[in-house]
A protein has these predicted regions:
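Radical SAM enzyme [4Fe-4S]-AdoMet core and its adjacent flexible, acidic
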Residues: 135, 143-145, 150, 154-247
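C-terminal accessory regions of radical SAM enzymes
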Residues: 1-24, 200-204, 234-247
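Conserved alpha-helical substructure of the radical SAM core
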Residues: 2-139
Length: 247
């Protein structure tokens, strides 16, 4: 069904994806571009991997932060398209607080890519979801790191954020915008009832889950004891047989 949709909605992207088997066989890249246009964020999460690049809780004043310019984005889009790449993910920070977000999407050119945006869901209501769909965004990847409001809000250091994600999931579905969850997994979490409860929740909501391994960078730079090992990796593979999750 997704292929049929892509073929009619974004034929250029479909054509590039259909060429992936040949590219793989010939050793060419089919890389997904995960693109951090700006590090602006309205959260101060416990595990933030880019916390050294912005001023927590003062993002409006962080004028000296690193960022791309729109002309850089146009050049990147052109080069990626010429390489036959087909997937583009706008990440951050929190992409939906970028003031020139619409211009950013236009600079990427949605007709050339299957376009995904990350979001913590705080600003994503139905009207916003409809707008994202209208300007060419194909999928939203919502961050959710707990099966309960208490777990998620504590991890994200943002009271009320779990409820905002719940709203965002429904908003995307109502706007016919593809949606998946993104969650961080670390050594201790995979052994908890909370982890299975989280996966059961995603299954009930009929949304897939992208599982991100915690890494010893940013705010987790010195939290090496919580990194996944081969043992936990094998346990995660067992969960993959039961739930719609991928890494």
């Amino acid at each position: 069904l997704r292929q049929n949709w892509l073929k009619s909605y974004k034929p250029h992207v479909y054509k590039k994806m259909m060429d992936f088997p040949r590219k793989i066989a010939e050793g060419e890249s089919i890389a997904i571009i995960q693109f951090q246009y700006d590090y602006l964020c309205n959260f101060d999460c416990e595990h933030c991997c880019i916390d050294k690049f912005y001023v927590p809780k003062n993002w409006e004043k962080a004028s000296g932060r690193r960022k791309f310019e729109l002309e850089d984005v146009r050049r990147l889009s052109k080069e990626a398209d010429e390489l036959g790449l087909a997937n583009f993910v706008i990440t951050g920070g929190e992409p939906l607080i970028i003031k020139e977000y619409d211009q950013l999407v236009e600079a990427i050119d949605p007709s050339k890519f299957y376009l995904v945006t990350d979001s913590n869901g705080w600003h994503l209501d139905y009207e916003k979801a409809k707008h994202l769909k209208k300007i060419g965004v194909d999928k939203v990847q919502l961050s959710l790191d707990g099966a309960s409001a208490e777990d998620h809000d504590t991890f994200r250091r943002a009271p009320g954020s779990w409820e905002r994600v719940m709203r965002a999931i429904d908003a995307c579905k109502d706007a016919d915008l593809h949606v998946i969850l993104s969650t961080v997994i670390w050594k201790d979490r995979i052994y908890t009832d909370e982890w299975r409860n989280f996966l059961e929740f995603a299954k009930k909501k009929q949304v897939g889950t992208y599982v991100v391994y915690a890494k010893p960078v940013g705010a987790y730079e010195n939290v090496t004891d919580q990194m996944m090992t081969e043992t936990e990796g094998k346990i995660l593979q067992q969960f993959e047989e039961e739930y719609d999750i991928f890494t």
